[in-house]
Structure formats: C-alpha cells, structure tokens
Amino acid sequence: MKEYDLICIGTGSAMAVVEAMISENPKAKIAVIDKDKPGGICLTRGCIPSKLLLYPAELVRTIEKARTFGIDSETKNVDFKAVMERMRNIIYKDINKIRQGLSESKHLDYYSEAAEFVAPYTLKVGKKIIKAKMIILGTGSKPLIPPVKGLNETGYLTSDTILEISKLAKS
C-alpha cells in the first residue's frame, strides 16, 4: 500500500488545491486520479468547447450585420464538420498537454483509471491500494436526463453528446 499526503480525484478545478500544496510543500506526496480525459469538465465538455463554437457563430452574425455598414456580404456556407473538428483539435491538444504534464510531473503520481473506496481513507486504483489522510473528490458532473415519457424513443442530445456530432441538426 502506498501512502500519500493528498489524493485528488479529478483533474479540473480541484487541481488548484494540488498546485497550492505543491507550492507550499514541494516534497508532499500527492496522487492525482482521473478515469476520464484530464482537464476537467470545463475543458473537455463545458466552458471551453462552447466558447470555441460560439466564435464561428459570432463571425457569421458579424458578416450578416455588415450590410448595415454598407458592406455587401453574405455567408454562403458554414462547414459545420470543420467547425466541430477545429473545436475538438484545440481541446485534444490541451488534454494531451495536461496528460503529459501529469504523467511527467516529479511532484505527483498520476493514475489514469477509476478509483473506489475500499476502507476509510483508502482507495483501490486499478490493482493498487493507496491511502491518504486528505482526499479531494473533484469528480465533476453529468447531464441530468429528465424522466420525460417518450424521450428515449425520440432521441435527444446532452451537453456531452452535442460535442460529438459532426452533422448539423435540422433544428
């Protein structure tokens, strides 16, 4: 069993605590665990992807408003697939940088797999057992699917699945 001063589950906003601890005590033993893509929900399927998609939409709106300034312009086509690929490429670059930084860090051990409590202050990560007196649960959130009759048959998109589409929906 490996013992740590701090175990952090999640690589989003909880990493601020990890960074502060490293800054205060560079010799602290720290484990960071994330079964998903590192970077947290804001980077992987929240704030950042939505902002990257808003910018092209704002450009289209600006082009359409150009007529009010006497500029004859129009948007003939929006390559939705290219817009989505651009967003994904930017995000995956950041995810890969974070993963590399975590994997190569001399200040922490990075576990890219699921964790489960097996005893107080004790986690099983893969086949390893680790322990700490301080454990941060920064595990993010998931979309809530309301119990609407017929919703599953109709089909729906969530804030997670919308980022995976490559063809623009009709409505």
Where are the language model's segments positioned?
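Glycine-rich flavin
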Residues: 2-3, 13-14, 20, 24-28, ...
